[in-house]
């Protein structure tokens, strides 16, 4: 299913999330199962299925990584069950530095400063990747789509690192 069509957007990485939320509410009102309570069982089942599609579409389009994955899937590149790893040497080196920094936080003289520095580093790198991804997804070229898939892999890794950093920060605050 093309969620961009469902929500009446042109396939693009940058979408107006306020408009997305508004269209989500409109679609929810139109297909909500309560609206079909007195209809046939088939109509009620169809309403439940349609509601699930609307919910999944909304969750997909509001999350930048899932939105990018969806755009790539529409172009025949499925990253959902993939085991391909990032081959970018510079990124792998950066990844190792971040991992070491995560391990060193607890022994740091000022753990919160180390955490803040890592958050800043993640944000700067994520911004750089997002700019590349936006340009690559807007291109119609197959090569750019493959490069965009690499950016998505990197962003997924960074999301895991961010979650790990949040867990470390929460543990230090306890």
Curated annotation (Swiss-Prot):
CDD domains: DnaJ. PROSITE patterns: DNAJ_2. Keywords: Chaperone. GO terms for molecular function: ATPase activator activity; protein-folding chaperone binding. GO terms for biological process: [2Fe-2S] cluster assembly; protein complex oligomerization; protein folding. It holds the Pfam family HSCB_C. It comes from the Bacteria. HAMAP family: HscB (MF_00682). Co-chaperone involved in the maturation of iron-sulfur cluster-containing proteins. Seems to help targeting proteins to be folded toward HscA. This is Co-chaperone protein HscB homolog. It comes from Shewanella sp. (strain ANA-3).
């Amino acid at each position: 299913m093309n969620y961009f069509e469902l929500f009446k957007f042109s396939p693009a990485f940058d979408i107006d999330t306020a408009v997305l939320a508004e269209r989500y509410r409109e679609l929810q009102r139109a297909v909500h199962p309560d609206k079909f309570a007195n209809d046939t069982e088939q109509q009620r089942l169809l309403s439940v299925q349609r509601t699930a599609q609307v919910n999944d579409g909304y969750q997909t389009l509001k999350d930048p990584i899932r939105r990018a994955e969806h755009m790539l899937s529409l172009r025949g590149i499925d990253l959902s069950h993939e085991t391909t790893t990032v081959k970018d040497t510079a990124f792998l080196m950066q990844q190792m530095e971040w991992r070491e920094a995560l391990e060193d936080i607890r022994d740091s003289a000022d753990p919160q400063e180390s955490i803040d520095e890592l958050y800043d580093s993640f944000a700067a790198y994520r911004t750089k990747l997002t700019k590349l991804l936006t340009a690559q997804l807007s291109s119609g070229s197959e090569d750019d789509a493959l490069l965009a898939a690499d950016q998505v892999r990197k962003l997924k890794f960074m999301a895991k690192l961010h979650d790990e950093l949040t867990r470390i920060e929460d543990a230090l605050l306890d």
